């Protein structure tokens, strides 16, 4: 029989899993506990922002029958959810993991959002295949994108041979 898990048990399990992921990725580990504590402190704000994203999708897509459908069946919401967590890790300067997370979302959904991009609340991507949002992109509030849109990577300086200056 499966019993209900308490909030504390779920958080402890999530913390253990995140620690295991960090330990597998990094030879020179960051301060695991600091990273985990900081990320968990940001989860309520991430959830609030994701709630605005669900609302934007529900209100912006006539085919959406309910908010639960958006959360469970919309690939774009999955990509945005992963991005929002990866973005916080990126801001915390956690190396590699944020990019791995958004590349995973890209492989699942066809939506490529760099973890360094800035994306405001009430964000919705409808039919998101081929959407690319680069690291330098800044997206405000109440924005809706459709398939095949590329944003960012236009502001880099280039050398005489056409290669990017990093």
Regions found by a protein language model. Name each.
Residues 3-103:
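Terminal amphipathic alpha-helical/low-complexity segments used for targeting or macromolecular assembly
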């Amino acid at each position: 029989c499966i019993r209900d898990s308490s909030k504390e048990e779920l958080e402890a399990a999530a913390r253990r899993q995140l620690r295991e992921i960090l330990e597998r990725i990094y030879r020179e580990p960051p301060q695991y506990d600091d990273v985990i504590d900081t990320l968990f402190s940001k989860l309520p704000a991430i959830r609030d922002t994701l709630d605005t994203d669900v609302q934007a999708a529900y209100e912006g897509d006539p085919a959406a029958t309910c908010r639960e459908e958006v959360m469970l069946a919309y690939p774009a919401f999955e990509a945005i959810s992963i991005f929002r967590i990866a973005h916080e890790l990126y801001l915390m300067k956690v190396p590699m993991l944020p990019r791995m997370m958004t590349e995973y979302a890209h492989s699942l959904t066809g939506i490529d959002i760099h973890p360094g991009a800035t994306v405001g609340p009430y964000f919705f991507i409808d039919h998101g295949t081929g959407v690319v949002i680069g690291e330098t992109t800044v997206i405000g509030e109440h924005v809706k994108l459709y398939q095949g849109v590329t944003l960012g990577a236009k502001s880099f300086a280039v050398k005489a041979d056409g290669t990017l200056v990093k």
